[in-house]
């Protein structure tokens, strides 16, 4: 597959500044948070993988925000369950 150009990804996001924010956020998820790439990695670095995901329309600012909210809700639910378990043992 040909390399992703910034212009291709900008068309999906809207402007270069938002593209940088979305791509950096997604690359960080792939590199350090253990999130699975949605495209074939092909020995690419996380930043290139993030740009390819954006170009293919798989990642947007809205999808990242929604995923973060779901993760936060799951964490809060687990914390509440732990607290309830501790209180019920007393």
Curated annotation (Swiss-Prot):
The reactions it catalyses are: RNA(n) + a ribonucleoside 5'-triphosphate = RNA(n+1) + diphosphate
| Gene Ontology terms: biological process | DNA-templated transcription
Gene Ontology MF annotations: DNA binding; DNA-directed RNA polymerase activity
Q: Which Pfam families match?
A: RNA_pol_Rpb6
Protein EC: 2.7.7.6
**Record-linked InterPro entries:** DNA-dir_RNA_pol_omega, Pol_omega/Rpo6/RPB6, RPB6/omega-like_sf
Keyword field contains Transcription? yes
**Subunit:** The RNAP catalytic core consists of 2 alpha, 1 beta, 1 beta' and 1 omega subunit. When a sigma factor is associated with the core the holoenzyme is formed, which can initiate transcription.
Known function: Promotes RNA polymerase assembly. Latches the N- and C-terminal regions of the beta' subunit thereby facilitating its interaction with the beta and alpha subunits.
What is the protein named? DNA-directed RNA polymerase subunit omega
Which species does this protein come from? Alteromonas mediterranea (strain DSM 17117 / CIP 110805 / LMG 28347 / Deep ecotype)
């Amino acid at each position: 597959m040909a390399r992703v150009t910034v212009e291709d990804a900008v068309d999906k996001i809207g402007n270069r500044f938002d593209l940088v924010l979305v791509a950096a956020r997604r690359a960080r998820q792939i590199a350090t948070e253990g999130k699975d790439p949605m495209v074939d990695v092909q020995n690419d670095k996380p930043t290139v993988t993030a740009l390819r995901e954006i170009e293919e329309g798989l990642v947007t600012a809205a999808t990242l925000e929604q995923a973060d909210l779901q993760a936060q809700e799951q964490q809060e639910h687990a914390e509440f369950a732990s607290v309830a378990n501790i209180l019920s043992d007393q």
